[in-house]
Amino acid sequence: MTDTIRADGRTADQLRPVTIERAWNRKAEGSALVSFGGTRVLCTASFTNGVPRWMSGKGRGWVTAEYAMLPRSTNDRMDRESVKGRIGGRTHEISRLIGRSLRAVVDMKALGENTIVLDCDVLQADGGTRTAAITGAYVALADALEWGREHRFIGQKAAPLLDSVSAVSVGIVDGSPMLDLAYTEDVRAETDMNVVVTGRGLFVEVQGTAEGAPFDRSELNGLLDLALAGTTALVAVQSAALAAPAPGCEG
C-alpha cells in the first residue's frame, strides 16, 4: 500500500502537510487556522458565561458548533446560505458532527454553566473540510477553556477537557486504500469515510459510504487502521500547537 504514489507525490498512507496556527483571531477566546494541504479552515471559539434556557439550573455547560463555506472557497463562487435564506442539509449535518465530536471529550459538569460555540469557516476547500474543522476546532476549544479558567468562569481544579479529538478521511481510490483524500481523490473514491477519534484511540464517529462497489469487513478494518494511524499523527500536531506560546485574545 505504501508503494502507491498519488498525484501530489504522497504515499497511500501519508497525510497532506498539516499545520495549526493558534490565536489567528485575536478577538476570540480561542481560535486556530488549520491547514490540510490546500484545505484551510478558520476555527473560532466563543466563550459565554451562561447556557441556553433549556439547560439553565442544571449545573452543566454546553458546546456546539456551526460550519460554513466562504463563497469562493471552491473553484466556482457559490452564494452565501444567508442570502439564500436557508441553511442546507450538508451544512446542518457537518455542524452537528463537529459539535458531537467536541462534546465527546468535554465534561459538561466540569465546564459549569458556560457555553462555547465553535464557528468553523472554510476559507479554501480541497477535500476533508469537516475533518480539518474538527481537528482545528479542538485546539480552539482547548484555548477557550483555558481562557475560562483564567477568568474564573471555570473552577481552578476543574478538568472539563477529558481527551483530545481529531478526524481524518480515508477511502479506496482506484482500488487502493488511501489516507486524507484531496478533492480530486474524493470525487473518484469507490469508498469514502470520515473517522473521528479521541487521543486515546477511541472512535467517536465513523461515516462510511460505498460510492461504487460495496466493501467487505477486511477492507473496513484496513481503512480504520489507516485512519487511526492518521489521527495519531494529528494528535502530535495538535499537542505541538498547544505547547507553543500563543498570543492571548483581546477580549
From Swiss-Prot:
Pfam family, any one: RNase_PH
MF term (GO), any: 3'-5'-RNA exonuclease activity
E.C. number(s) listed in UniProt: 2.7.7.56
SUPFAM superfamilies from the UniProt entry: Ribonuclease PH domain 2-like (SSF55666), Ribosomal protein S5 domain 2-like (SSF54211)
CDD domains assigned to the protein according to its UniProt record, in alphabetical order: RNase_PH_bact (cd11362)
Protein family (similarity comment): Belongs to the RNase PH family.
Protein name: Ribonuclease PH
Keywords: Nucleotidyltransferase, RNA-binding, rRNA processing, Transferase, tRNA processing, tRNA-binding
Gene name in the database record: rph
Assembly notes: Homohexameric ring arranged as a trimer of dimers.
Enzyme's top EC category: transferase
GO BP of this protein: rRNA catabolic process; rRNA processing; tRNA processing
Function (record text): Phosphorolytic 3'-5' exoribonuclease that plays an important role in tRNA 3'-end maturation. Removes nucleotide residues following the 3'-CCA terminus of tRNAs; can also add nucleotides to the ends of RNA molecules by using nucleoside diphosphates as substrates, but this may not be physiologically important. Probably plays a role in initiation of 16S rRNA degradation (leading to ribosome degradation) during starvation.
Residue ranges crossing the lipid bilayer per the database entry: none
Record PANTHER family: EXOSOME COMPLEX COMPONENT (PTHR11953), EXOSOME COMPLEX COMPONENT RRP41 (PTHR11953:SF0)
Annotated InterPro entries: ExoRNase_PH_dom1, ExoRNase_PH_dom2, ExoRNase_PH_dom2_sf, PNPase/RNase_PH_dom_sf, Ribosomal_Su5_D2-typ_SF, RNase_PH, RNase_PH_bac-type, RNase_PH_CS
Source domain of life: Bacteria
Binding residue positions for phosphate: R90, G128, T129, R130
Catalysed transformations (reactions): tRNA(n+1) + phosphate = tRNA(n) + a ribonucleoside 5'-diphosphate
